[in-house]
């Protein structure tokens, strides 16, 4: 599954209880995926998304949070557009929902950005804004030189609101116009990882981080065509750095770390030079390479999320310059 789809599928399954957070997400989804139409003299809301799971999430939230009914219309792909699209349409209560979600102001005029209640909301509301915007019109490219998280925006006002929401989370995003289309873009790998964590896409983050590490290893291998003793020492330093991250993860989580993740982490720390295959064979009972790698990735992601919530340094804090020294 493509990275963008895997992030959206995971976010669509995320269980959110707090009403204000769900409202912020719905407002963002309708703003970034939707539009207002006048049909037979009444206001109709339509929001077009690319995944059925996203459409179902939006429809459920509209019913559960606002008490309005909607329908999902499947638009078959054709021409340059691949795959089906899904339109969530609110007809009967379109105007009421538009006012409730900030698409219309108190005088019935269209709002170009996001409603002030959302813009000035909590950090959880800011996370919900990004979650809704990404579900509506976001994309995530493969890690590498041109990696980016991007959201296409309906206008400059909504783009600036999204940049502001990121800023409230301590994340730097840039608004730019490309060929007449407003976009908000994040290119820094660590920043992308932090935002995936804040949105709640922890499984997708682990996949993205794994691919990112592979790219970095491959790039390093390409640069070092002829290995000498110094290069071999650097490889050993990288392994030590990985063990240091796990050390920090165990320290952050303390007694809260699940036993199976703790066991995988302790194996990594105890055998810093071992490959994942070797770690799997050292486990009791033995595990596959993918199983041990998955547990270590989940341990690091869980620790970094906890560190982010507590406002303390994450797992990278244990990686010293000497470990990365070339």
From Swiss-Prot:
GO terms for molecular function: DNA binding. Residues 275-308 bind DNA. Coiled coil: none annotated. Keywords: Cell cycle, Cell division, DNA-binding. One of its GO terms (biological process) is cell division. Belongs to the WhiA family. Involved in cell division and chromosome segregation. This is Probable cell division protein WhiA. It comes from Arthrobacter sp. (strain FB24).
